[in-house]
From Swiss-Prot:
The keyword Hydrolase applies. Residues 6-149 form the Nudix hydrolase domain. It comes from Shewanella loihica (strain ATCC BAA-1088 / PV-4). Its cofactor is a divalent metal cation. HAMAP family: Nudix_RppH (MF_00298). This is RNA pyrophosphohydrolase. Its EC number is 3.6.1.-.
Length: 174
């Protein structure tokens, strides 16, 4: 679904483990890594799209995860001109995304990148929480930064608590 401004409705998914790490996936046959994401179909809610994409891209079902939170608003990024399909109607100039933070509740073995029969990723790994902001393709970086900042108090409760105390650790100096 592309809106009147040319932005395609999309959901982004951040899956975290109990150690505060996030799932980072490599695009099939490419050297680029990102969080799972995908379009919202007509008549589908953002949450329904998230669960569909969760299965299609990483093979997880609702019982494998717990939804911790979602972004308060839709976040947008523009595609670089070289990626815009000029002959496409309606013209899509970027994505507007609703993001979801999920906690993996099952074993890692439940992750199956080929579950849908059309894998979008060919590898994945756990990375530190802020790592994706530095590593994602440049045109998505601002959205990733905003999402990670919004989700940090939920995903990293101890870090968020430290930040409210001026970022200092208690204890003696060395």
């Amino acid at each position: 679904m592309i809106d009147s401004d040319g932005f395609r409705a999309n959901v982004g998914i951040i899956i975290c483990n109990r150690f505060g790490q996030v799932m980072w996936a490599r695009r099939f046959g490419q050297h680029s890594w990102q969080f799972p994401q995908g379009g919202v179909d007509e008549g589908e809610s953002a949450e329904q799209a998230m669960y569909r994409e969760l299965y299609e891209e990483v093979g997880l079902r609702p019982e494998h995860v717990q939804v911790l939170t979602s972004t308060r608003s839709w976040l947008r990024y523009r595609l670089p001109k070289r990626l815009i399909r000029q002959d496409s109607k309606p013209l899509c100039i970027g994505q507007k995304q609703k993001w979801f933070l999920l906690q993996l509740k099952s074993q890692e073995s439940a992750i199956d990148l080929a579950a849908s029969g059309h894998p979008e990723f060919d590898d994945w790994r756990w990375v530190s929480y802020w790592y994706p902001v530095r590593q994602v393709v440049s045109f998505k970086r601002d959205v990733y930064r905003k999402v990670m900042k919004e989700f940090a108090p939920t995903a990293l409760p101890f870090q968020a608590q430290e930040n409210t105390q001026g970022g200092r650790r208690r204890g003696r100096r060395r």
